[in-house]
């Protein structure tokens, strides 16, 4: 009809010239939806293809949002290092805009005084080498509990991500509160509701919210995602609120100290909301991303028997038949190379967490306008054939004689980010990922349901805040001779 033509023409004229001048090149956007329809279900993969056409930096219009994507080590270095301060703002997903949480969050808040205070506690108290080493026995005991649980399920099909996720929840329960959250295999034990809330948060983080592309929809919460996040946070806070209350009372009646995060946080001067937000992010980031990484690691091991054999030779040489200890990890270069290779191909957050420009600035001679959203395609950088030989081949050997690391200085490998926004828990995360993987390799062979051949294993990805394997990995543990 004539009315439809007039409306369409009007909207086109509005959106046609809405992009700021001087942006990096990119595909031509459609009216209203921009480039949304070009992304498909795997934006990280589509971004890598677009980089082949448009280069280091390209721009998109996602709904009404202007987005710039960095796709090479050079562009990543410019974003995360050279212009780190001015591009250090955080774009907060609509579903996670829970005021009390965002204002006290180390992940989502601006780099303000509260953020600096929280960051300092992480850097100087929680994730120091001394603190990590002092809690090694806790992580080792939880890893062995996982091994014992799987030994009881030899011959049975297990969803390994759930087993690992539960193990990580208990690891963090002990690191933070000095207690298990629940018992593996017993769904009626302990604070199972907290495990369920954490799992639900993972699902919400991996869901799409149209309000991220059309912010005016945020006020309506059409799909109830914001309410779901708020309810999950409240449920989690209520569980450990009781634990914190008990600890405060105990501290008032005796002077004994426990070697855990809560002891440090209660002595740090943080208020309850800051403690709640920090614990949520330690639990959330530590469990969700690490469980995904370990699932991918085991998937690669089952598809690459020679890699498994190489790791077992190293384990036998360094560890023998006793349980693996974290102190063994520095003496196992192949294990370390294996973890790097897993993170290269399967970074848990494929586009990192989006940044936001605090001011208009120039990057590689292009204009990045104020409030622009910036993504760094860590997944694409890790698979770039210009940077890696045979990039799709899983080969830990590529790191054996290489100084490349994932600590934020080598921009061809940035699974944890870089700059002031780098994940503060990198030293801890790499320890328990290495510990759990090596413990599983040492103790088990693996089969597949219905005798499926490893070559048939599907290695598809499900895009979200974390990059999950699709379908999930189901394997059958077998005792080793």
UniProtKB/Swiss-Prot annotation:
InterPro entries the UniProt entry points to: Cyt_P450 (IPR001128), Cyt_P450_CS (IPR017972), Cyt_P450_E_grp-I (IPR002401), Cyt_P450_sf (IPR036396)
The reaction(s) this protein catalyses: (S)-N-methylcoclaurine + reduced [NADPH--hemoprotein reductase] + O2 = (S)-3'-hydroxy-N-methylcoclaurine + oxidized [NADPH--hemoprotein reductase] + H2O + H(+)
Entry GO MF terms: heme binding; iron ion binding; N-methylcoclaurine 3'-monooxygenase activity
Pfam family, one: p450
Induction remark: Up-regulated upon elicitor treatment (at protein level).
EC identifiers of the protein: 1.14.14.102
Main localization category: endoplasmic reticulum
Keyword list, A-Z: Alkaloid metabolism, Endoplasmic reticulum, Heme, Iron, Metal-binding, Monooxygenase, Oxidoreductase
Membrane-traversing stretches: none
Domain of life: Eukaryota
Expression sites by tissue: Restricted to the parietal region of sieve elements adjacent or proximal to laticifers in roots, stems, leaves, carpels and hypocotyls.
Gene3D superfamilies: Cytochrome P450
Cofactor(s) this protein cannot do without: heme
SUPFAM superfamilies, alphabetized: Cytochrome P450
Function: Cytochrome P450 monooxygenase involved in the biosynthesis of benzylisoquinoline alkaloids. Catalyzes the 3'-hydroxylation of (S)-N-methylcoclaurine.
Protein name: (S)-N-methylcoclaurine 3'-hydroxylase isozyme 1
Organism: Papaver somniferum (Opium poppy)
Gene from which the chain derives: CYP80B3
